[in-house]
A protein has these predicted regions:
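N-terminal secretory signal peptides that target proteins for export/translocation
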Residues: 1-7
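Bacterial N-terminal signal peptides
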Residues: 9-22
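N-terminal, polar/Ser/Thr-rich
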Residues: 27-61
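Non-catalytic architectural context of zinc metalloproteases
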Residues: 46-49, 59, 65, 69-71, ...
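N-terminal-proximal low-complexity accessory segments that begin disordered
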Residues: 51-57, 75, 85-87
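Ligand-binding face of N-terminal immunoglobulin V-set domains in extracellular IgSF glycoproteins
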Residues: 67-69, 79-84
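Juxtacatalytic substrate-recognition/specificity segment
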Residues: 70, 232-357, 363, 367
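C-terminal recognition in membrane/secretory proteostasis and scaffolding
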Residues: 368-369, 378-647
Length: 647
């Protein structure tokens, strides 16, 4: 009893000390935070007052300027908040180019109305609507990038990419689907265009589209250009599908019959996979250009695709560009129709959450390559070589040691595709390609456990193929993915997925390659696909030997964490000046790597970083190494079955 009484006294004394300390802290000198301003009105699922008229003049192609006028219905005397789209679908991030909005001026009944930017949310503009005003005239410019360092170039003297999210201000407080827009665009004389929007009328260079919800408008960009062609990819099909091409020159639009057939086969193979479609019509927008910025961005009834100018005219040299269209087309099912519940938002200024991108992007990456092979856009060997490159890359990325695959779904928000000094350690949007390997693992496991009677094709049809013809988004949770997998083959799919999403094991998840009947190997000769990738990126990729990727003038644009070059202190931006005492060139460096395999001498490099020169000795003796997949005859050739066209 005495001991207890003593302990109680101590506890009471400690409590008194804590309370007195709390009082002292509460009374301490120093600044206190100001209260935050009232939050922007949350979106409600009710219709906006009336349609907003949106007029875009896209004729100033020399200066890359889009000129915008909106007429927005308002309630007289009531405050209004206008939002510039911030969280952009498909970007999975707050990437709206608010810095490119300029010249914002608002008028009511001909009189200037001042606006004030929100002190916390820079994408929001407060407007005091005058008494007696029933609408506001809102004028501004989208001063799009002139050069790549400013952002993606979307307008050139020969083509443009109009993304409506860049040229729209809209009222806060409403779901995007409840705001109606009446859009009009003025294009340069003689240009042609394509979009998923439906045309109401055309008067010379001025086109008026049928009214659309803000949701649909933002989901329906325009590609327009001086050199344009349109190809029917599904003549007589259930819903029109077209390939709409703009190019830097007219000769780049030449498409051979077999190339057209491969793109038509893409549509048919997608229908065989999913057993449905989720659009009234679909436009694959394709820009073949060195001047407008590249892109791959999904929409429900269209996709934006920008790739090398010689996509068709030098077909055999561009294998690594031919999975782009299948990837973006697949998103009509996976990403636009079936959408993660935490990624869907009611308007474009509510934050997205990206936790299920390993389905949205990872499985799309998987089906993109599979459909490319089944359609004949890629040969089986090219597809295997592409998979070898992916498997090797992730087998050498040691960042998994500290950062799980699940966390890379946050990368679009955290990094927003900014350059990384140590990508193999920091990790990037690995939910795409490591996600692809995870879904290959799942596909081959389903095949193995079902005696090769079921496959991930069955999951795709059951999960993405529902509600044929509907393009109202159908959201899902992690549990829904697990349930759908169990409907194909009963298994502990939750543990399977969480182990791969949350694990920190060394090396890439290569069980799918092994179960698919192949093994990852390295030889001294690169595949044609690997060489095509090097050529398009304008680099020499020595990742699997010296641990570097070398760009023009011997400058390193990637260094593998814990690789030979890393261990000698080389970094991105380092320039190789000399190899073994002779002036640098790529062939000389490759010869030195080969020679070092035959002797004990180190490879000596004179390097420059900034204004500092030094000599490093790379003690590397394993020769040139390039990834390939080699057939393992002890396992069924499931990968070959996966890549075979469906009848």
């Amino acid at each position: 009893m005495r001991t207890s009484k003593s302990l109680s006294s101590i506890v009471l004394s400690l409590c008194a000390l804590v309370l007195s300390a709390g009082c002292a802290l509460a009374q301490s000198p120093g600044p206190q935070p100001l209260p935050m301003p009232a939050p922007i009105a949350a979106p409600r699922d009710i219709p906006y007052l009336a349609a907003i008229r949106l007029n875009v003049d896209a004729t100033d192609v020399e200066r890359h300027i889009f000129r915008v006028r909106e007429t927005i219905p308002v309630r007289a005397g009531e405050p209004l908040v206008l939002l510039y789209p911030q969280w952009l679908p498909g970007n999975h991030s707050p990437s709206g180019p608010i810095d490119k909005l300029a010249g914002l001026m608002i008028h009511a009944n001909g009189a200037r109305v001042e606006w004030v930017r929100d002190p916390v949310d820079v994408f929001a503009f407060h407007v005091a609507v005058p008494a007696g005003a029933t609408s506001l005239d809102v004028d501004f410019q989208f001063v799009s990038p002139v050069e790549t360092p400013e952002g993606r170039v979307v307008m050139t003297p020969d083509m443009l990419n109009l993304q409506w999210s860049a040229v729209t201000l809209y009222p806060a407080g409403y779901f995007a689907r409840q705001i109606t827009i009446e859009p009009t665009v003025r294009l340069p004389d003689g240009w042609q265009f394509a979009t998923a929007l439906e045309t109401a009328s055309t008067n010379g260079v001025l086109t008026t589209f049928k009214p659309a919800s803000l949701d649909t408008l933002v989901d329906s960009p325009i590609f327009a250009g001086r050199y344009f062609t349109r190809l029917d990819l599904d003549p007589g099909g259930v819903a029109p599908v077209h390939l709409d091409i703009i190019a830097d020159r007219a000769d780049l639009l030449e498409v051979k019959p077999e190339q057209l057939e491969a793109h038509r086969a893409l549509v048919q193979q997608a229908y065989k996979l999913y057993g449905s479609h989720h659009y009234n019509h679909y436009d694959i927008l394709l820009a073949l250009t060195d001047h407008m910025g590249g892109i791959g961005l999904e929409h429900h009834q269209s996709s934006e695709n920008g790739t090398v100018p010689t996509y068709f005219t030098e077909w055999d040299k561009n294998a690594d560009a031919r999975d782009l269209l299948p990837h973006e087309f697949t998103h009509s099912w996976n990403g636009k129709f079936r959408r993660p519940a935490d990624l869907w938002t009611p308007n474009f200024n509510v934050p997205m959450r990206d936790s299920l991108l390993w389905v949205y992007e990872g499985q799309t990456q998987y089906w993109g390559f599979v459909l490319a092979a089944r359609a004949g856009l890629l040969t089986r060997q090219e597809t295997l070589d592409a998979l070898a490159s992916t498997a090797a890359a992730y087998d050498h990325h040691v960042g998994r040691e500290w950062r799980a695959l699940q966390d890379t779904t946050n990368d679009p928000i955290a990094a927003m595709r900014r350059p990384l000094p140590w990508r193999s350690w920091e990790r990037s949007e690995d939910c795409y390609s490591e996600g692809q390997l995870t879904w290959l693992d799942a596909d081959t496991l389903i095949r193995e456990k079902s005696g090769d009677r079921r496959s991930l094709d069955d999951f795709a049809k059951a999960f993405f193929g529902i509600n044929d013809g509907s393009f109202v988004p159908s959201t899902y949770l992690f549990e829904d993915v697990v349930k759908a997998l169990n409907s194909v083959v009963p298994y502990d799919w939750e543990t399977f997925l969480r182990a791969r999403l949350d694990g920190h094991g060394l090396g890439a998840p290569l069980d799918g390659v092994t179960r698919g009947g192949y093994r990852l190997v390295y030889t001294e000769t690169p595949s044609d696909y690997f060489k095509s990738s090097e050529s398009r990126r304008k680099v020499t990729d020595l990742t699997y030997s010296l641990g570097v990727v070398i760009a023009a003038e011997g400058r390193l644009n990637d260094v593998l964490w814990e690789g030979p070059a890393y261990k000698k202190g080389l970094t991105v931006g380092t320039q190789i000046i000399a190899v073994n005492g002779a002036a640098f060139d790529i062939d000389r460096l490759k010869r030195a790597i080969k020679d070092a395999k035959q002797n004990a001498s180190a490879i000596e490099l004179l390097v420059k970083n900034g204004d500092r020169f030094r000599t490093v000795a790379l003690d590397y003796h394993d020769g040139l190494r390039y990834p390939h997949l080699e057939r393992d005859g002890s396992m069924p050739a499931r990968l070959d079955q996966i890549l075979t066209a469906r009848k």
